[in-house]
Every structure is written in structure tokens, then in C-alpha cells.
């Protein structure tokens, strides 16, 4: 694509169409943009547009498109072509910093993100001058530019907060500190001076406080891994100024908005985080500054209002106290009874109250409320912070804290009892306080795993929770109902089974509540209860115990999907999946009705897939429906195909990328259930599955390979007879997969199925080429994974076609190659093979080579006979060799960049491990003994003499054991 006006005009038109809400306009535009993004100059055209277009919407759209392009394509993946040409890479890096700094803020943010994505790959080795270029801009005095630099630095360095320690990381941070720490400190001091100079200029202060917030975030990132010497030497400068900013109260920066945090709150929040970091990790060095920070933060907490805009500040301030009170160093600051009472009264209880803003979120923004309350993304909420502070205080003062809080709980419950209609929020706070007081350790899987023994959870459940669960009006006091459900959910491991069984039918009735939060919690609680393990590794709650409620449970779950706000509720769909899995054959009578509802839902969500978890559980539920029903009656598979194929066809025709991996897995499951030949409906689809475009997407590869394996297993002969022209396409897929380090094992899965299931004559003409491709890959890139797969394939070939055929095909490629493969690959590497089936294939294949290949007895290959036998006995008896060569780096298959749908394995579409040898060989050791006996009978004296001269004593002893077990001997 040339950098010319015509191309800029075309790109502008398609970007505009890509914003169109009408999918018939938008989708083709997106497809066009996708099709041209591989062209050289495409990213430069986008940069030109975002710099020069007269239309601001197009500029922003170009910036977002550019950032997403970089996200998808910048990383260079081994075995794959470079998606951004080298000239484009050079031009982008040469211009992007300047462009970012001269752009308006909306565009600046997108380009800043793009720089950090590029930096993640290229900095520092391939972009050594990035930091220097950025630091020099600090001298510009223009805070629009300075803030652009700070924002970019923040997005570049914030990964230091969660990266694992490594020498590479240390050297990068050291380079950053050497270049950046001093200019950042100078900028910090200069900005604070400017704040004093412009103390009455609100516009100047807004810009300066934005800078201070970014500087404080950078301080956090650069200090997270370890305390750098530079910051230790300059601690006085940083901490004195942080303390000054924490106590600053500039009326000009106060906002009228009750929701949105202002600049002052954001800055103080970050400073609280910075102080907490030092208090936790560098307490010795921080000790001189700690008392004044504790005082400042305490004063901040008792003087800050309940408005939402202060939530982040208050939660970070409380988190600071929580991190301090957990450290033995600072225990003395909290041990006084009056201090504990004061903390409880002035900090914890006020911040556990259910405010009108929380009530609004509960009613009007339920998705966000659930995300925060259930999924632990409440990290910056007041309640979560107050809860953490309670836990922190209980570490050293469990008795006194429990006593103080119990008094508050009792008084709150007494207030509620006086007038439940008016005072229900008191009970809500009491439940939350009990929960935070009782919870010592919690996991997503088991709920509370360790509880405060001073709190009687069962008694509280009976006296205060059960009444809300039993209430006939599920729509009355929805917050308290949600609290009660959550109590059951998080204390499920502490409550006795009879209480949980009592709760189950009550939870089922709450699935019909109008409140989204309430019916979502009910679904989630049921799903969690159904996953609890009982004494014999079975489920705690059994299908028999669920029998009286099965119909109502299924009805209410599916009805709740029709409630406003829950059409794609992932918790409900997960509960449906778990219910199917728990009840098994008990759901069969209901499946004919439910499958219609599930397929209808699938059709709806496929129009615009937006809830990945919901979609995943939906497909899992479909798989369970198929497996459970067809287990009892395999013939019913056709009724599922009738229900599902029309929807699947639409998904395939519309290329709904997110759903293709799922569709292929469900189709595999259906096809694998067929007992005889392959149905014609599947054969019609077969050619389409070989289209190269499908194989370009990483997420499609594992499920497509499995589907092709199912085709080969059920219809190898049919393919050979009626679709022989498609065999080259099938082998083309194998060739593509085998060339990739990430996917070569998938190529072998496919190849093994071809060898096992295709009629031998149908692939005779291709066999030699297959081996040549494998040798080329061995020469260019020999990895442990490849060798293990290669060994399994070679031995499967020996099992399927015989040892003579194996020897002949090797030697037809190059004379004496069979010996080279035995000596260089099979003998030294076979011990690396893992997996029972894989080991069995190798054992049977090698046994055939040892006993059914005349060349092993009468040619120069004879010298390899005993080492090969020794290697086979090693495969049987020695531990698996799991060493990996020093020079082989780990290939991270999962971490594929960009917007490709990652492969989502469906747990309930699980494929049984296939044993191509099956019952033909029960015990490979016995087979070896019998085969050696047969060989020795054919050439008496040879085998014992070969064994006695060169097999080591230990291996010989093992072999004697095999012969005895098989009741045979060598002659």
C-alpha cells in the first residue's frame, strides 16, 4: 500500500464504516481492514491519518485501530512470518514518541499504550534510545508534553509490579533507574515548587496535580521489586513531600461531583499506596517516617466524608493501616484498648455501612456490584478495606477485637429488630461485620477455609440468616436476602451438611427473585454447593438428595435467564452446567425440552458474542446434554444433530470466530458417538475443514485436529473412497502443523490417525514424502517435544505396517538411514516418552523391530539389536527421562498475542484417551518375551549368545522375569 491520498481516502471510508452500528455495514469494513493490515505501510497510513485528518472522529478511530494493530502484530512469534515489515517498524519507532507528545490527549493515550506494547517487546535491546528521548522532554517546561511522557513511562513500567524476579528484569530496572530516577526526582521537586507558585491558579494546579499523581505512580512501580539505592538515598526528599501532599487541603481542587474522585483524592490515594508499600516491604528504612504517616492517614480517615468520590482514597488509607498493623514491628501502635475501640468506631464501622450509593449500584448497576462483591474486584472498596483491617487487627488482637465488634453486632441487630422496614441497613452491616470477623482465610474454591473460633457461625446462621432465606416473599429486602445467600456461600465449608441441605430448596426459590443480585447469588451459591466434596471423594450433595427438587431447580434456573438483566448471566449458566453434571441421568427426561431452550439461546448470543464466560458454560451444558443422554442411548445422537446443526451452520457461515473452536469440539463429541460409518451431513462439511484460513487462527487448531481425527476414525475408508482428492489437503494441514514448534504435536496427532485409520493403499504414494518432511524438521529444529512425538509415530508405523516396512521406507530415503535413526534417536531418546499409551506403542513397535525385521539379525544393523533391547527394557523399568537440553528454550504456547480467540477447552467435551493397540496387547513385557521366544525358535542359539555378550546384568535380570511371567524360554 503506497502512502498516497487515494489510500488515505479509502482507509478513511472504511474506518468510518467500521464505526457503523449496522452489522451489515460494519462487518464487511472490519473484514476489509483485517485483509489489508498485512500490507507494508498500513500502520504508517494510520499514523498519517491520526496526525492529519480533518475529522476528529477519524483521528481517534485511526489511533485506536493503530493501537489494536500493534497489540495484535508487533510481537514476533517463532515459526510465524513477521507481521510488521522491518521498514514499518523502524519508521514507527522513529516517529511515534514525537507524534504522541504533539497529539491531543484522547489520541495521546492510545499512542502511549502503543508505545508501551512496543516497549514491552523491544525495550531496551531494540529500542535503546526510547528513555533518553522521553527524559529530554522533561526540560521542555510544557506540561502537556511532560504528562505525555509520564503517562507513557507509567504504562511501560507498571509491569514491574507483577513481573517475577529475574536477572533480565533487574538489569532492565537498573537501566531505567540510571536514566530516569534522577530526572524524575528533579521533576517531582520542581512540580511541587510550581504548585506553590501557582497556588491560586486552578487551571495550572489541575495540570500540575495530574503530573504529581503520575510521578507517584512511577515511584510505586520503580520501588516495587526492591528498594533502589537511589530512592533510599533520596527518601527524605520523597517522604517529606509525600507527607506534605497528604496533609494538603487546597479548596480550589475540591470538586462538587459526589461520584468522580478529584485530582487531590487521586494523588493522596496513590501516596497511601506508596506508604503502604514501604511499610510492608522496607519497614526498617521507613521506620523514621512511619509515625507521621500513621497520624496523617488517621486524620485523613476521620475527616473524610462518605461520598463515593472518596472511596479509593479511604480504601487505600485503610489498607495502609491494615498493612501496618500486621507487622510485628508496629504492633505497639495498636495494642491499647482505647486505640482498638477508636479504630472500630471511627474507621471500621462507618466504612461497612451500606450507603445510598451502594443501594443504587445494587439496583441499577447489578453487574458491577456482583463483580466487586463476588469476584474480589472490590479491592478498592471501603468495605473490602475495612474487612482487611479487621483481619489484620485479629492477627495480634483477636480476643479484644472480637469482643469489641460483638458489642457492635448486637447493638446493630437490636436496632434492626426495633423496626426492620426502616433499619434493615443495620442488619446488613452486622452480617458484613460478622463475615469479616470470622473469615481468617478464604479461597474461591472452598469459601472460608479458616474461621475465627470465637464466632459461632452455625448459631448466627440459625438465629439471623435462616429467617431471610425462609421468607415467602423473595422480593422483600433483597439486600438482606443477598447477604443471607452470600453467608451460606462463603461459610459452606463451616456449616454442617444438614444446614446446607435445608438451604438448597430455599436457594432454588430465590432464583425467581426480581433482583438481579439476589437471583445471581442464588445461582452462584447452588453451583458452589454442588461442587463440594463429600467423604468418599464424591459430591457432598448427592443426586438422590436432589431428587425432590430436580424439576423445580431446572425450571427456575431456565426461567431466571428470562428475568430482566440476566439474559446472558454467566452465574446462572454455570449453575445449569453444574446441575447437569451433578444430576447426570436424572436430567434425561427434561433434555428434549431444555435442548431447544439452549440452542435458541445459542442462536441469539451468536449474533453478537459479548459474554465469553456465559458462552463457555452454554457450550459445556450442550456437551453434558449430549454425553448424558447418549450414554444411556447412543441412537439419540441424531436428535441432537437435528437440533444443533442449523445453528452450527449459521455460526460457520457467518464466521463467528469466538464460537468456532466450541462448535468443532461439540461436533467431535457427536461424531465420536456414532458407532459405524460417517453420516453424509458430516462428509458435506469435510472439504471446508481443510481451508487454510481456518488453520490460521491458533484457537481453531486443537479442536479442528480432534474433529479431523474423529472423521478419520469413523470414516477413513469413506474418505479414501469418496474424497480421495482431499487427502493432499489433509496432508497439507499436517505439513503446516509440523513446521510449527507450538503446534507440531497436533500435526502428529493427525498423522497418527491417518496411519491408523486410512486404508494403507490410499496413502502409499504419500508415505515417503511424510518421512522426508519429518526429517527436514528434525534437522532444522529438534526439540524434546518433537522427538517424543516422532518416536510414537515411528513405532505406530511399525505396529501398523510392520517392522520390515519401517526399515525399508527409511532406507529408501537414504541408504543405512534406518540404522542412523535407531542409533541417534530411538535408542538414546526413547526413555523420554511419557504416557501409558505412548509407552505401550513404543514398546510394541520396538518389539516388532527386534523380532520381525530380518535386517536386525543379518546386516550391519545387528550391532544395534542389543542396545535397542536394552533401551526397551529401560523404557519399561527406568524412571522417565524428563531432562530438557540446555539450549532448548521453553515455548509458551498459551501466550499468543493479539486478538485471536485462544483455544477454550470444553471440560465436558472431553475425549477419551485412545489406545490404537487396544486389547491386542495386554502386557507389552509379555509380548516381548513371547516374541523373543518365537525369534529364538526360528534361529536357535543366536538370541542367548547376543544377550550374554552385550546386555548388562540388570537388564538381563529384568528380561528373565518377563520370560518367567510368560512361561517361555529362549533356545
Swiss-Prot record:
Q: Give the protein family.
A: Belongs to the XPO2/CSE1 family.
Q: Which GO terms describe its biological process?
A: protein export from nucleus; protein import into nucleus
Annotated PANTHER family: EXPORTIN-2, IMPORTIN-7, 8, 11
Q: What is this protein called?
A: Exportin-2
Q: What is the lineage of its organism?
A: Eukaryota, Metazoa, Chordata, Craniata, Vertebrata
Q: Which GO terms describe its molecular function?
A: nuclear export signal receptor activity; small GTPase binding
What domain of life?
Eukaryota
What is said about its interaction partners and assembly? Interacts with cftr.
Stretches assigned to the Importin N-terminal domain: 29-102
Output the InterPro entries linked to this UniProt entry. ARM-like, ARM-type_fold, Importin-beta_N, XPO2_C, XPO2_central
> What disulfide bonds does the UniProt entry report for this chain?
none
